[in-house]
């Protein structure tokens, strides 16, 4: 089930990083981000990666040149991406639309897609070679908002890797931008979907007022020492594949009385429970599961087509670790469903208000775990003219945030993959517990009395 992040040896020859600016003049202005955008929990860089095969129909065309030129054209419409972030009163983030541009790296690798093999997955072990961390480019304020590297392969394919300042967009907004680059690369002069800024739609009310309980932003100070922060340098990475058999085994553990539940709900509950068991959390510690929910079109909350800002919230459910670990999977699923049920127009407004009232706090970290379902985000659909990628998805998870992505394993089986970061001994226990949970299980039989 697990795909270890094993070493992969090949060399990459990179050119000096360039700045790509909008192809035409753009407005010089300062635009505020929304109160959903600029919270502390969005102030990081999110990496994505896409692997493309050689396409005989594109013979003679250089993906580096095609994408670089299309990028400049797309930035005319998405000109805020070519600016730099600044911070105002109460830590309010704004983008100074300077037109300075984004970072772009041209590269060549002495390998092929076939040789990459199992590296074509989340937690790609060679990612640092495929997206060079340009010194000084990772700060949230004053740095380029996007970094792109296009790496040609010996087979004629290529790899597109990108890093985005998450305060600017979520996955849906990023895909909208990438689709525009793809359209420009294939000859369009105007995007089929024009970008909309309008970040004020997700600003706090006046006056702001917190009207909902937000477990995802609670300050946790007193713990029993089993909810420790994790140092990324001491963690190991694994990607876990869930095919038809694993999903069936998990569903066979559920009673009919639970009712309908999605594959994502089942996986989220399973990973959360196994992870908590692996950490050997004190039974009396409070743990929480946070659900990332895209608010576009949900519960009557309409955002205009083309809106490319962050448009998601992360409602959470809490329980004692002992309750989560000793109860069957059904218990965890009900908590996942409970968190998702918090989503409403009022909940969204309450989050924005909380950001202003409490100074844009970071989400709760001790005892928290979050999984985002990006299977419908469209990362596997972006076409620069060479067709859809062999794989497209988030390149890295975070210690307490992971992602569910669609994936086809080496056997050709389609399923879901979830990358995980954990300390080595915890990872070993997590994998053992996950194997136990996904073994072929007996169907639950409930009494008819």
UniProtKB/Swiss-Prot annotation:
GO terms for molecular function: acyltransferase activity. Expressed in berry outer mesocarp, but not in berry skin. Its EC number is 2.3.1.232, 2.3.1.196. The gene is AMAT. Keywords: Acyltransferase, Transferase. The active site is at residues 166, 383. Acyltransferase that catalyzes the formation of methyl anthranilate, a compound implicated in the 'foxy' odor character of Concord grapes. Can use a variety of alcohol substrates when assayed with both benzoyl-CoA and anthraniloyl-CoA. This is Methanol O-anthraniloyltransferase. Belongs to the plant acyltransferase family.
């Amino acid at each position: 089930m697990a795909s270890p992040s094993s070493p992969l040896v090949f060399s990459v020859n990179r050119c000096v990083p360039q700045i790509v600016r909008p192809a035409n003049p753009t407005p010089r202005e300062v635009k505020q981000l929304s109160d959903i955008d600029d919270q502390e929990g969005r102030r990081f860089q999110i990496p994505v990666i896409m692997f493309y095969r050689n396409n005989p129909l594109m013979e003679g065309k250089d993906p580096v040149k095609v994408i670089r030129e299309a990028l400049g054209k797309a930035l005319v419409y998405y000109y805020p991406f070519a600016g730099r972030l600044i911070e105002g009163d109460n830590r309010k983030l704004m983008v100074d639309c300077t037109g300075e541009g984004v970072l772009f790296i041209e590269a060549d690798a002495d390998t092929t897609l076939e040789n990459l093999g199992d590296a074509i997955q989340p937690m790609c072990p060679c990612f640092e070679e495929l997206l060079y961390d340009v010194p000084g480019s990772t700060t949230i304020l004053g740095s380029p908002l996007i970094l792109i590297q296009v790496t040609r392969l010996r087979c004629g394919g290529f790899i597109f890797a990108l890093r985005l300042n998450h305060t600017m967009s979520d996955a849906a907004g990023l895909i909208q931008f990438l689709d525009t680059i793809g359209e420009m690369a294939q000859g369009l002069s105007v995007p089929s979907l024009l970008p909309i800024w309008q970040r004020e739609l997700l600003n706090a009310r006046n006056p702001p007022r917190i009207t909902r309980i937000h477990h995802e932003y609670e300050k946790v100070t007193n713990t029993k020492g089993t909810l420790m922060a994790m140092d990324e340098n001491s963690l190991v990475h694994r990607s876990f594949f869930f095919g038809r058999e694993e999903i069936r085994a998990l569903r066979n553990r559920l009673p009919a009385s639970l009712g309908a539940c999605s594959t994502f709900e089942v996986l989220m509950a399973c990973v959360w429970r196994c992870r908590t068991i692996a950490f050997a959390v004190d039974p009396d510690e409070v743990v929480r599961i946070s659900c990332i929910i895209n608010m576009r079109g949900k519960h009557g909350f309409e955002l205009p087509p083309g809106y490319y800002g962050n448009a998601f919230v992360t409602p959470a459910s809490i329980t004692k670790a002992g309750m989560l670990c000793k109860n069957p999977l059904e218990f965890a699923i009900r908590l996942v469903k409970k968190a998702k049920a918090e989503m409403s127009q009022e909940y969204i407004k309450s989050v924005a208000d909380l950001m202003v009232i409490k100074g844009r706090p970071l989400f709760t970290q001790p005892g928290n775990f979050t999984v985002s379902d990006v299977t419908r985000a469209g990362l596997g659909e972006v076409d620069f003219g060479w067709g859809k990628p062999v794989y497209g998805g988030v390149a890295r998870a975070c210690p307490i945030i992971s992602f569910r992505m669609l994936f086809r394993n080496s056997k050709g089986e389609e399923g879901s993959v979830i990358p995980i970061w954990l300390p080595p001994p915890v990872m070993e226990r997590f994998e053992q517990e996950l194997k136990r949970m996904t073994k072929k299980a007996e169907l639950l039989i409930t009494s008819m009395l």
